[in-house]
Amino acid sequence: MKQWIAALLLMLIPGVQAAKPQKVTLMVDDVPVAQVLQALAEQEKLNLVVSPDVSGTVSLHLTDVPWKQALQTVVKSAGLITRQEGNILSVHSIAWQNNNIARQEAEQARAQANLPLENRSITLQYADAGELAKAGEKLLSAKGSMTVDKRTNRLLLRDNKTALSALEQWVAQMDLPVGQVELSAHIVTINEKSLRELGVKWTLADAQHAGGVGQVTTLGSDLSVATATTHVGFNIGRINGRLLDLELSALEQKQQLDIIASPRLLASHLQPASIKQGSEIPYQVSSGESGATSVEFKEAVLGMEVTPTVLQKGRIRLKLHISQNVPGQVLQQADGEVLAIDKQEIETQVEVKSGETLALGGIFTRKNKSGQDSVPLLGDIPWFGQLFRHDGKEDERRELVVFITPRLVSSE
């Protein structure tokens, strides 16, 4: 193909001020890329270094474009890369650059491999050495090693000085105390009137106003259960600034509530804490044709699992899992009887302030009470004593409520 070298025209647009960027008109047809780059470099009085792998031709027609834009257009069309240091312009291909980077990395790796190895021991104050070692192994050099001393919670390192310094800085950033949350809970059965006295009123709040003090968001619908005396839903509310312990004790003395349990737990950031209250019910399990039986157990417990997440500005996010498992019906089978367990489980996530109390409710029970009041002696007289006796029945509806108060524990 005929090359029109003479058609390579680089013409400066006369400028009024020297500060203005120079513009060029470039018209080339099937001209070697190296020659076009040489002409552009001479225009700016730059020294040009072209790598041996720069080849090929280019055809361009540019009119009155800035010199830098013209250079970028030529380089981009040829698939090249430029680098300017002072008045030296270097041009090479992408493949050459990748090979050069790989060669430099290989030389650095060889240099690292020849460095002398040193031993170092890092004692961790807060983090678990075993967990930290899993992530820290990636920072070791090819000849480096890391050993965990579980007894003293130390990392035993052997590597070159550069790698050890990087590891020490990384460990210092990771070995920080995690937030601790104290969880105070009260699991009670209470009637509706006493619940209102505590300032809790189950209401359906919209998303914008959910979680206000004394207001409760209904998070779930009723769950079906086997017994007719248990009704399950799920409500959640907040109580601020209350002496909850004293008020619950006072209501218990008035026989207006029963405190089932008052556990206190200490949980770390993102670590679950759980409490269970109940019993394990044994039942026999047949092993098939052999006829042998073994005893296994089913849990009939009230359980609560809380996983706290420590947030900014004294706020805590709680992931809650509450379960109420009670003995159900006795099922008849060919090899005997099996006790069913009625399960109600609720899982939710809420965000509260430190010291704010959550009220979790929605599991209802009914108690049918019957009693007799009579006048002493006279009430015991047959037939005639009915005039001096009073038979009464009371249908009491109580709700199982869990009050839980998370508080941030200072690490100082």
Swiss-Prot record:
Protein name (Swiss-Prot/TrEMBL): DNA utilization protein HofQ
Annotated family = Belongs to the bacterial secretin family. PilQ subfamily.
Q: Which Pfam family, any one of them, does this sequence belong to?
A: Secretin_N
- Mainly resides where? membrane
**Molecular function terms from GO:** DNA binding
- Keyword annotations: Cell outer membrane, Membrane, Signal, Transport
SMART domains the record matches = STN
What biological processes does GO assign it?
carbon utilization; DNA catabolic process; protein secretion
Any single Gene Ontology cellular-component annotation: cell outer membrane
* Keyword Electron transport attributed: no
Q: What does this protein do?
A: Required for the use of extracellular DNA as a nutrient. Could be the porin responsible for transport of DNA across the outer membrane.
Its annotated compartments are:
Cell outer membrane
Q: What happens when the gene is disrupted?
A: Mutants show a stationary-phase competition defect during coculture with wild-type cells and an inability to utilize extracellular DNA as the sole source of carbon or energy. They have no defects in DNA uptake by electroporation or when made chemically competent.
